[in-house]
A protein has these predicted regions:
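Conserved catalytic core of the tyrosine transesterase superfamily
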Residues: 1-327
């Protein structure tokens, strides 16, 4: 059960903060961290005896400065809370200054594979023939195509696929159950129809090869153990370096890049189809095992392709993802 933390807002901003937080939670956002930062802003407003809700640059002068010993991420969180509230106030006819200062730590730009890169990568994965004469290496070479498709087609995490148990895969319904994933979350992952058919054929082949149904859905060289995460990292790098695209890419992708690609492709499709992504992100965050929709938004904000789609939908961009174009 979700626990919402509420605070005793008291300043001239109080009614607007309460309405804003309620609106965000109605959309599925937990908003506990931001509500706390807004409480601090409320106290700041009260302590400075500001008797109106209009946010101005002068009133925020002290607020945007770093506090003694404060990290950049904490400072950025405070400024971000004021920025979000200022946007909300402007929407409701209360003219306010929107701070655009970003002081948070730099995040590396994630390389999301485009269609050409994906085609090249999966071509290498599907055609790979081990140099080793070890039969288990040949078996694992047939496991990799399925594993990497689960990353891209279902947005699963590396360790979730590696440690997948046979009992967690419902082949009839095409549902994968993730137990105790990141943030101690359980969730259901629904496979697309064509991937479900591919996974069923893979499992039938695996049983014939081993002569029994294994405990692990992707057994390692020792079938009693699953393929380790570091092996997938290494194999992905090997496959990527075989592609022509790798020669022209400054930021090498990782298996996790396929999860990012899943998010970007899905959200881009929704935007181009005119679907309200604020609503759909609630479901996407559950599907991905994120703590809340904000975390899924963060995935989308990190990538170059987001800018291309947002610009194509320029008339709706400020409502859809208001901060993307400002970064």
């Amino acid at each position: 059960m979700i626990e919402y933390r509420d605070y005793p807002y008291q300043s001239a901003l109080a009614p607007y903060i309460r309405d804003y937080v309620s609106e965000k939670r109605a959309l599925g956002f937990i908003y506990n961290v931001k509500s706390y930062q807004l409480f601090r802003l409320d106290q700041y407003w009260r302590d400075h005896k500001y008797d109106d809700p209009h946010i101005t640059l002068e009133k925020l002068d002290e607020w945007i400065c770093a506090l003694p010993g404060e990290s950049k991420s904490s400072q950025g969180s405070r400024i971000g809370a004021a920025r979000d509230l200022a946007i909300y106030l402007n929407v409701h006819g209360i003219q306010s200054h929107v701070p655009i200062i970003y002081v948070g730590k730099d995040h590396p730009l994630i390389h999301v594979l485009d269609k050409t890169e994906l085609k090249e990568l999966f071509s290498m994965i599907d055609s790979y023939v081990p140099r080793s004469t070890n039969h288990e290496d040949f078996r694992m070479a047939d496991e990799y195509p399925i594993m990497f498709r689960l990353y891209y087609c279902c947005g699963m995490r590396n360790d979730e696929v590696c440690s997948l148990r046979t009992s967690d895969v419902d082949l009839e319904k095409g549902i994968i159950t993730i137990y105790n994933g990141k943030n101690q979350k359980d969730r259901l992952v629904y496979m697309p129809g064509d991937l479900k058919d591919l996974v069923c054929k893979y499992y039938e082949w695996l049983i014939r090869y081993l002569g029994y149904s294994p405990f692990w859905f992707f057994p390692g060289r020792n079938p009693d153990k699953h393929i380790p995460k570091h092996s997938i990292d290494r194999k992905f790098r090997d496959y990527w370096l075989m592609t022509e695209s790798s020669k022209h890419c400054d930021k090498a992708p990782t298996p996790h890049s396929l999860r990012h690609s899943f998010v970007v492709d899905r959200v881009n499709r929704w935007i181009l189809d005119g679907i309200d992504i604020n609503f759909m992100f609630i479901y996407l965050s559950k599907y991905l095992g994120h703590k809340d929709p904000d975390e899924s938004f963060y995935y989308y904000h990190l990538v170059n392709d987001a800018f291309r789609i947002i610009r194509q939908k320029d008339t709706a961009s400020e409502e859809v993802i208001p901060e993307v174009r400002r970064r």
